[in-house]
């Protein structure tokens, strides 16, 4: 069993309120959950207007699937025109670790 997670630090475009920020971040998190069947949440910079942290995790039987899903998550977020990915950190462990 493999457990993988990704943490993305993103900058939002022309955002001037937390309400506007949430209107951008929440649909992204919802899309990650729906499309990839992962656990996802806004995890950092909760009080900043133009920054956000998004985390997602997956458990799978093989490493290749975990890598594939984490790649797809990073690409999906990077393709959103209103966000810029500043950093992406990945971690993977096996149940034997």
Question: What are these model-derived regions, one by one?
Answer:
Residues 1-39:
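N-terminal first-folded block
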Residues 6-10, 54-56, 88-90:
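A structural signal for short, well-ordered beta-strand segments
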Residues 9, 42-46, 67-72:
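A general secondary-structure boundary signal
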Residues 38-43, 86-87:
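A short linear hydrophobic-aromatic micro-motif
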Residues 41-62:
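Short, charge-patterned binding micro-sites
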Residues 60-97:
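C-terminal structural segments of small proteins and small subunits
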């Amino acid at each position: 069993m493999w457990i993988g997670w990704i943490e993305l630090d993103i900058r939002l475009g022309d955002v001037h309120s937390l309400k506007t920020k949430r209107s951008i971040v929440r649909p992204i998190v919802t899309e990650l959950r729906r499309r990839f069947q992962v656990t996802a949440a806004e995890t950092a910079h909760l009080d900043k207007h133009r920054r956000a942290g998004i985390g997602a995790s997956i458990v799978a039987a093989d490493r290749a699937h975990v890598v594939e899903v984490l790649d797809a998550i990073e690409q999906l977020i990077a393709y959103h025109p209103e966000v810029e990915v500043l950093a992406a950190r990945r971690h993977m462990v096996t149940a034997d670790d």
